[in-house]
């Protein structure tokens, strides 16, 4: 995304001094401390940090699954707590490490599940789902069961299920980590393209730094617990090779990688 476009847009999401602690048998543990950042519409943000630093916890808070935090989260300039207290539909989609497709349902029935639950199976929405299946190579498999598809195809189906509800913000929690290396390269690129083609805003949590650099407009680097923001890096790659590893030939790639890698090593 063009940096000037990002600067001039009102944030879709803003975190202000977000802090979160949880209780254990040994007492209170602070997981996140004074986390502040903004995300503009259409921006793809990756969050990286040491294992166990609280990356997934942060996504759970943004998704509304954890509410006992301090600080503020704003969605389109409205505090998230106000929206949640009025049971407002936040239009946030969540994609996890595992696809969570049900094998007793066909691919088509799986991707329509959210629409069924929300009673949104209109002709318009059904046409939209079918167009997504067609566009991303799953239309001919729509009557198959998930067990009949490859891991990469199942992850594409899981993303289409999320897109079917037309969310404004996508939260991606290690969605490629269960895939083998070759499939992961292909699917991460495919899903990155799908998100951009559909003009979605996305936050990706990943342990794979190369993946983060290849997909993101900016990378948020977290410290060890209690996690704070160590650095926010704007990413801009000059890519001339469209192969799955083409981003590594970008002249800026090694500079970004080494810079962020040093930050991560300092935390281990």
Question: Model regions: which residues?
Answer:
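Helix-to-loop junction immediately C-terminal to a conserved catalytic motif
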Residues: 63
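Conserved ABC ATPase signature
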Residues: 145-149, 153
């Amino acid at each position: 995304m063009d940096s000037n476009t990002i600067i001039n847009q009102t944030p879709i999401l803003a975190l202000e001094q977000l802090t979160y602690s949880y209780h254990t048998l040994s007492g209170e543990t602070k997981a996140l401390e004074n986390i502040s950042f903004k995300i503009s519409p259409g921006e793809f943000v990756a969050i990286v940090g040491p294992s166990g630093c609280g990356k997934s916890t942060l996504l759970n808070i943004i998704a509304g699954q954890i509410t006992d935090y301090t600080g503020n989260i704003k969605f389109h300039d409205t505090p998230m707590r106000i929206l949640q207290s009025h049971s407002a539909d936040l239009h946030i989609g969540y994609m996890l490490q595992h696809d969570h497709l049900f094998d007793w349902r066909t691919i088509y029935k799986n991707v329509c599940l959210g629409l069924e639950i929300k009673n949104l199976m209109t002709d318009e929405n059904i046409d939209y789902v079918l167009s997504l299946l067609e566009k991303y190579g799953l239309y001919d498999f729509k009557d198959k069961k998930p067990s009949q598809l490859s891991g990469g195809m199942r992850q594409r189906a899981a993303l289409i299920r999320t897109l079917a509800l037309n969310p404004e913000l996508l939260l991606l929690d290690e969605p490629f980590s269960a895939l083998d290396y070759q499939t992961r390269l292909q699917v991460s690129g495919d899903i990155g393209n799908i998100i951009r083609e559909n003009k979605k805003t996305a936050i990706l949590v990943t342990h794979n730094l190369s993946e983060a650099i290849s997909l993101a407009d900016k990378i948020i680097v977290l410290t060890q617990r209690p996690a704070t923001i160590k650095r926010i890096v704007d990413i801009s790659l000059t890519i001339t090779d469209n192969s799955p590893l083409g981003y590594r030939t970008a002249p800026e790639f090694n500079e970004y990688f080494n810079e962020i890698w040093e930050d991560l090593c300092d935390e281990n």
